[in-house]
Amino acid sequence: MKRAGGILLPISSIPSKYGIGAFSKEAYEFVDQLVEAGQSYWQILPLGPTSYGDSPYQSFSTFAGNPYFIDLEALIEEGVLTKEECDACDFGDDPCSVDYGKIYNERFELLYKAYERSKVYEDPEFQKFVKENAFWLDDYALFMAVKKRFDGAAWNEWAEDIRLRWGFALDYYRENCYFEIEFYKYLQFKFLQQWTKLKGYANEKGIKLIGDIPIYVAFDSADAWANPQLFQFDGENLPVAVAGCPPDAFSATGQLWGNPLYRWDYHKQTDYEWWTRRMEHCYKLYDVVRIDHFRGFDEYYSIPFGAETAMAGQWEKGPGMDLFWTLERKLGRREVIAEDLGLMTPSVEKLVADSGYPNMKVLEFAFQPDEDTGYLPHDYDRNCVVYTGTHDNDTLLSWFRTLEDDQKEFLFEYLGKEVSEEEVNWEIITLAMMSCANLCIIPLQDYLELGNEARINMPSTLGCNWKWRLKEEQITDKLLKEIKKLTLRSFRTERPKVEKEPEEAVVTEEEKEE
């Protein structure tokens, strides 16, 4: 990974008149702005269809895409929707926040109209897509259609015959939900078609896409329902244990995530076939993949199913390098960012080092006066990615406002001067950009100097996350020039070559006489 810079901006945050960011002209304009600012990477959040809580890290499928991101204007141009139909919908009235309730109610009704008018079954490209993606698409489309029949209930609350995937029940729902199944396939076809076009445009402009995947799948997902053998389930396809984190300084009872845990012994027996397919699919969508909770491949925290807190959990061994050697053998060497934040042990550090993948450094974690965090720039080596913060952090400005006095003093000492709220963002961004880290990713909110209102996610909370939206006028020509200036100064983009004037030839006296 060469020395470069990039910006973190979720697709959902892109400006749009239809309530949520999409693969629309505004997304293409953002690519152009990245180029103008001298950037090389655009990092996004997971693209999967979101469920209760709207978190992209709790998706109905690890392979499918979020229908919310389908560009409605492109469907208008295709003639399967009208502008009047789209404009008549209530997607919410706050241009700075996504109203997921209204998006859900309005979007799917529009998309179903588009599907009914599309004659997609006559499109050979659709037939090709269905065939090439059958290994996940068939189960996902059936899962979503059946979920709708059960009023959105989680699959463990469905009737026993379909919950346990009895043959006659599968046949029954495939026949009786045929049009709904085809609808969900159509959505995935349009999603991939539009995303591939946007990614191609970005790549042509020299912008690489950094995707993001959680290590675990959601329990209420097509992955868990259709492939129970991959997970630590009992005979009723209920979890034996679930994922989380142990008690620490931030939580006396730990974190109970509830994701099903993998049966790593089974994955190894299959030569990690499911993981191979998962990563192969990722590299059709992204140029680089950030894997969340990378330490879980070394050791994972296992909590008995039904426990009310994470206190009863214990550490279990993960697959380690065996998984990554297998992936490299089958897929070749690919670009990965290892998210190794949080509790680190020598064995986790060894796994990251052995993998050769760049790990992460976050400056908001750095300024602890009585602690050697490892996140200060003088501790970096080149093979890492530095961030001011991630989607789980507060914005830089809001973080600064909440620092304790001793933390501020330490920050000022490290910077070599005191800085005000008006100065702190660019001072810390400069610290990140000037570091030796090969890649520097800055959340757009930090360049915009926004406060807590622009925070993407507050971990362990529900209802107020994943909502922030950018307004078009917030990205100005002046801002792009300032970003480009800093990117040039930090040697994170190609610097213009200075043309030297040719030197005049010096003629000696002897040459003159000749």
Positions of predicted regions on the chain:
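Trp/Phe/Arg-rich N-terminal binding region typifying the photolyase-homology
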Residues: 1-80
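Acidic, mature catalytic/reactive cores of soluble proteins
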Residues: 3, 35, 160, 203-205
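Aromatic/hydrophobic pocket-lining residues that form π-stacking "cages" and hydrophobic walls in ligand
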Residues: 30, 198, 348
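Short acidic catalytic loops
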Residues: 39-46, 208-214, 284-296
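Structured C-terminal cap/extension of enzyme domains
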Residues: 449-504, 509
